[in-house]
């Protein structure tokens, strides 16, 4: 009888003991912290991208003409992150394994930041031209193709598998973007004739697609840099990746702005801006802050999850921006645009479902061993009761 009581006590300690309870509490706390960080980065990315896109279109709509300035506001906000180096000192992220190898050399890191900075500059320039020549609703729909580009780049650079759901998403997004080419009577705010409007529409379309490809390549390369070169996943690493490439890209755009002589026209442009000087300044400041918030959110999601997930969240703006464009800019929502939007949303849902399936697999793998242990424990209890 005494042996039965002692065995029962041991069983109780094994199932409900402090070590196991403590472990599960720490695990729950870690998951909560991770979800909180991801939610913050998602909010920064969605709010920043939506506001920045609408402000960029407003700049062109009310008399702004400088694509160099519109490119510059996407990049010049990097000094806003500098105070974070001194006031924020969070612990390293535990969502990924940190290797014990030594930190990459200064030369290697410099090449990484310079290379990414040049790509970011090219992407931003194409973005500015695309937004200039296309209605914001059309531009937003074409930008959804970045998800397809990112899947391809991630396959080669980040060992991402192309599953049936992802393949379905690629096909739908490609068809969605292709449909927008066949719109007859493309709109252009500065067109003087149908032929001129058509040529500008084609240029805008090419620039929008090129911008989407460039953005996707930057995300995949950033993910690759963290995995293979930086090999550390701290908040400081996020700030570094958001700051240094932006610094390089800003230098490139500033050279372009002064080299092209575009800076000479900025004072006249400000004087003639339809909403006035104050609005001109506020729009550009708002764009700068919004783009920097978007950048921090994007890099943060790359570290916490993956470049693919960051791009998926970015495309969540898809149904929001075209609707807001119709409300604020009176963009025409044609039948082709509606079909393109439906296909793009379908592609996004397919992509998102694949990510959901991937997230569920680790949980199911953990549940299987636990269920086996429970069955064994029940058998032990039955034996003890029979004894």
Swiss-Prot record:
Entry GO MF terms: purine nucleobase transmembrane transporter activity; purine nucleoside transmembrane transporter activity
Predominant cellular place of this UniProt entry's protein: membrane
Keyword NAD: no
Transmembrane segments: 36-56, 68-88, 106-126, 129-149, 162-182, 201-221, 238-258, 283-303, 309-329, 333-353
UniProt KW keywords: Membrane, Transmembrane, Transmembrane helix, Transport
GO cellular component: membrane
Region of interest: Disordered: 1-24, 362-387
Compartments where located: Membrane
Coiled-coil parts of chain: none
Membrane topology: Multi-pass membrane protein
Pfam families: PUNUT (PF16913)
Record's compositionally biased regions (Basic and acidic residues): 9-24, 370-381
Single Gene Ontology BP annotation: purine nucleobase transport
PANTHER family for the chain: OS09G0467300 PROTEIN-RELATED, PURINE PERMEASE 6-RELATED
Family stated for the protein in its record: Belongs to the purine permeases (TC 2.A.7.14) family.
Protein name stated in the entry: Probable purine permease 6
């Amino acid at each position: 009888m005494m042996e039965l009581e002692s065995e029962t006590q041991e069983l109780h300690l094994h199932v409900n003991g402090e070590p196991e309870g403590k472990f599960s509490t720490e695990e729950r706390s870690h998951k909560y912290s991770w979800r909180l960080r991801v939610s913050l980065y998602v909010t920064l990315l969605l709010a920043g991208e939506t506001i920045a896109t609408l402000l960029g279109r407003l700049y062109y709509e009310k008399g702004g003409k400088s694509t160099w300035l519109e490119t510059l506001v996407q990049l010049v906000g990097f000094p806003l992150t500098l105070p974070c180096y001194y006031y924020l000192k969070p612990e390293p992220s535990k969502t990924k394994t940190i290797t014990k190898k030594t930190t990459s050399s200064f030369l290697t890191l410099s090449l990484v930041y310079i290379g990414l900075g040049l790509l970011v500059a090219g992407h931003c320039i194409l973005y500015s031209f695309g937004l200039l020549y296309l209605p914001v609703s059309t531009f937003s729909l074409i930008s959804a193709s970045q998800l397809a580009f990112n899947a391809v780049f991630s396959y080669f650079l980040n060992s991402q598998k192309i599953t049936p759901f992802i393949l379905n998403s690629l096909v739908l997004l490609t068809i969605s973007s292709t449909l927008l080419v066949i719109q007859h009577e493309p709109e252009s705010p500065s067109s003087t004739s149908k032929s001129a409007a058509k040529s500008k529409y084609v240029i805008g379309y090419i620039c929008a697609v090129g911008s989407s490809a460039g953005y996707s390549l930057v995300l995949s390369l950033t993910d690759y840099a963290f995995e293979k070169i930086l090999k550390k996943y701290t908040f400081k690493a996020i700030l570094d990746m958001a700051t240094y490439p932006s610094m390089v890209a800003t230098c490139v755009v500033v050279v372009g702005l002064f080299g092209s002589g575009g800076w000479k026209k900025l004072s006249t442009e400000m004087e003639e801006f339809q909403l006035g000087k104050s609005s001109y300044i506020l729009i550009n400041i708002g764009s700068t802050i919004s783009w920097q918030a978007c950048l921090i959110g994007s890099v943060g999601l790359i570290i916490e999850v993956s470049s693919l997930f960051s791009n998926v969240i970015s495309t969540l703006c898809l149904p929001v921006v075209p609707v807001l464009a119709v409300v604020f800019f009176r963009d025409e929502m044609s039948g082709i645009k509606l079909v393109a939007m439906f296909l793009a949303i379908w592609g996004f849902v397919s992509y998102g479902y694949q990510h959901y399936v991937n997230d569920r697999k680790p949980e199911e793998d953990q549940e299987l061993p636990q269920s086996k242990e429970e069955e064994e424990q029940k058998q032990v209890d039955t034996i003890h009761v029979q004894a």
